Amino acid sequence: MSNMVPVMDKKAFLRSFLKRHQLKRRECAWLLNYLMNDDTLMERVHFLNHSEGTPKALVISAQGIEQIPFSFRKKHHVTTDCEKAFHDIRLNQTEDIYIELHFQERLTCPQYLAVLEDNPYLPETQERAQAFERKAEALLQESVRLFQLKKLSEAIDEALDNGDKETFMELSEQLNRLRKS
């Protein structure tokens, strides 16, 4: 249930973030600037509150936060070397990059909340997506059924107006079957 966040919004957020917050590791600002300057890469960037389970994640912290300064995780390998992360991103530009940022008041920052996405790899996100899909399917089926009921009623009225008893009986039978379903 990933929502598409425009590249323009992601870049605006990162610019604002880098102006307002001092990162624990300077190389992280360099890495974020590198991402920001490449629209193709920015299309693959996703900001998450929790990056657990994602295939490729950057965890970056600002000063004043009790979190590790930086970590890069790809599959089951974790490193705190920003340069390794840069080389992996540069060499694998078709892979999505999930970024978990830690900074003061992140849950009340409107620009951050505007680019924040659900982690598609967390079980509760998948369950929520499946529940949403089931509800959407049920709504669609009910809409189709109501449309069919309306069309059948209109056709029955037309058959009555035309005095067509055979069509009236046939359509009435269809209408009754549809109402029971």
Curated annotation (Swiss-Prot):
InterPro entries: IDEAL_dom, UPF0302, UPF0302_N, UPF0302_N_sf, Virus_scaffolding_prot_C. It holds the Pfam family IDEAL. Belongs to the UPF0302 family. NCBIfam families: PRK03636.1. This is UPF0302 protein ABC1905.
